[in-house]
């Protein structure tokens, strides 16, 4: 089956067959009393955000939707609906888009989306994926959100740095294949490669916290590295932030691969990006409840007085200022 046989409308209708979603659904559910709307947008471009030489289309679809719902979770809200526009390049036809869509549907079902909209448009510059995600936040939970304080705990939802190492391994493998026609052996590093190709976010983490009466004082999605999150945290709270190098979680053989690629895993965690982990700050009085009931999260640091800034604390106790691409350094700001 090809686009030339069924056309755009027929293709969209065919893609929805066997899914719990409806094609051309004019979704507009009213918010429940006591809720407020949250919306986020994301654009993903071939050659910038993904490389189809090695990226399985089903994984790409799954990852795209995961990123969209992750943005909603990072707003301390629950995802409800997503509208997707796929820009289809000339080298792709219906079977490839079907594979991409299948991954999107899997992720949408995992996160309980009530609506998944789709449009297909032609693209002259490679595959593109535009996401518009909406969700809701309980007004009572918003009102209960505490003001960030020094000593609030900084918590992350899973290992960091693996995505960048996985990306680097795939890029190296693609280059080697182009040069020598030898396929890379990725079996030893499946978890690390998977962290880049198919990141996962725990769908019920926010609900668990709400049920336990744990209300984060701040929340972020680590998409550009932990350093970027800490910079945002310091800016938004007016406080300092300390993260301890020996508390950062890593996948099992991250350091082995880091040595092979000559990449420091701590640097990958801070500046690599693409991990798509949730980062919360939690009042220190909730530490025991949090540790006991949300064991997939790791406590990696805490907020501090504002003169501290954003720092990484080494195992020897040395505090190193954190820098992130896209942010002006303190020295630059003083000029």
Residue ranges and their predicted role:
Residues 1-335:
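Helix-biased detector of long, well-ordered alpha-helical tracts
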């Amino acid at each position: 089956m090809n686009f030339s046989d069924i056309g755009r409308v027929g293709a969209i209708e065919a893609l929805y067959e066997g899914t719990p979603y409806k094609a051309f659904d004019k979704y507009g559910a009213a918010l429940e009393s006591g809720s407020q709307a949250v919306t986020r947008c994301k654009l993903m471009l071939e050659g910038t955000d993904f490389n189809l030489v090695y990226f399985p289309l089903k994984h790409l679809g799954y990852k795209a939707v995961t990123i969209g719902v992750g943005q909603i979770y990072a707003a301390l809200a629950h995802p409800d609906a997503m509208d997707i526009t796929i820009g289809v390049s000339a080298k792709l036809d219906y079977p490839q888009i079907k594979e991409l869509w299948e991954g999107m549907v899997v992720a949408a079902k995992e996160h309980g989306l009530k609506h998944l909209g789709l449009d297909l448009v032609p693209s002259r510059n490679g595959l593109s994926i535009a996401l518009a995600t909406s969700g809701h936040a309980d007004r009572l939970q918003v009102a209960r959100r505490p003001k960030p304080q020094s000593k609030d705990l900084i918590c992350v939802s899973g290992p960091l740095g693996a995505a960048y190492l996985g990306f680097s391994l795939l890029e190296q493998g693609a280059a080697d294949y182009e040069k020598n026609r030898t396929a890379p052996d990725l079996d030893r590093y499946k978890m690390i490669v998977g962290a880049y190709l198919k990141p996962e976010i725990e769908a019920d983490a926010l609900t668990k916290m709400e049920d336990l009466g744990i209300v984060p004082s701040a929340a972020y999605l680590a998409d550009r590295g932990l350093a970027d999150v800490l910079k945002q945290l310091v800016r938004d709270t007016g406080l300092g932030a300390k993260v301890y190098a020996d508390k950062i979680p890593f996948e099992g053989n991250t350091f082995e691969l880091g040595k092979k690629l000559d990449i420091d895993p701590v640097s990958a965690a801070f500046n690599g990006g693409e991990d798509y982990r949730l980062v919360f700050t939690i009042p220190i009085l909730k530490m025991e409840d949090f540790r006991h009931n949300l064991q997939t999260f790791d406590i990696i640091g805490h907020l501090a007085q504002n003169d501290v800034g954003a720092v990484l604390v080494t195992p020897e106790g040395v505090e190193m200022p954190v820098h992130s691409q896209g942010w002006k350094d303190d020295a630059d700001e003083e000029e």
